[in-house]
């Protein structure tokens, strides 16, 4: 399965852009394979994202905002959930990935 990050390249909100960049940079820095899906360029992808976010995770009003993170068809969470997992050092679990073994430094 591939981690997919749903983003909006044409967002006018600086906060959304920063959150999207934070997720993408973290995944790149940790060499986690992922696909960036731009929902502003594909109505089909936008509808898929909306449909596959569990009802209890959707906002009371309006549509969920990017970034939204999936592993295959499994919903991982939004930016706030990602940030919490980053702070608690549980990103691999959050993404549904096996943790990488800690690197061992040679003496």
Curated annotation (Swiss-Prot):
Keywords: Nucleus, SH3-binding. Gene3D superfamilies: Glutaredoxin (3.40.30.10). One of its GO terms (cellular component) is nucleoplasm. A motif (SH3-binding) lies at residues 61-67. SUPFAM superfamilies: Thioredoxin-like. InterPro entries: Glut_rich_SH3-bd (IPR006993), SH3BGR (IPR051033), Thioredoxin-like_sf (IPR036249). Coiled coil: none annotated. Its main location: nucleus. It is found in: Nucleus. It comes from the Eukaryota. GO terms for molecular function: SH3 domain binding. Belongs to the SH3BGR family. This is SH3 domain-binding glutamic acid-rich-like protein 2.
